[in-house]
């Protein structure tokens, strides 16, 4: 079944889920319950209602991660040269996503090593088993045309390939490199991931945002579902 067909068969939203547009409209009971739980510094918190999927959702910004059990909450992010890793424990119906900007550089969620530690630890605290984890990898696009000698996306992809191999976490699907920015959606309970390559017109805006964040970082003190990829 295509994603569009799946959307057509999706059940209508219950009255409590017919939320307003934008982040401020989220008032469902499940989101209130999630917000009431203790949160880590780098855990995503931009909740909204996704009208296309008729689900509550949380959008990950650079440096953030999120873990959830079940498919009642959609995890989403938009990537340029950044990389997002989705880790899934199907037996536990548990999954999570992160979004990192650079391979290494300190103890912050925007750096790959720490981003992976946050995600793996978050999953294991919720009952995941390390030996059951599977990975889906997205992003690393060459969207920053002014970077002729250093391709940040390639560096990010090379890092995560090496990291997952060293940790013996199998990669069951991936959509990386190329020149396109991407939107990624994860249904954490089933592990189903959707990826949409965005138009070239959107690449410059995403690249500018990433460049601005990287510029700020350079001035800051260093701190210590099966394997197929579905398009939508």
Located regions from the model:
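Active-site-proximal betaalpha loop/short-helix elements
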Residues: 85
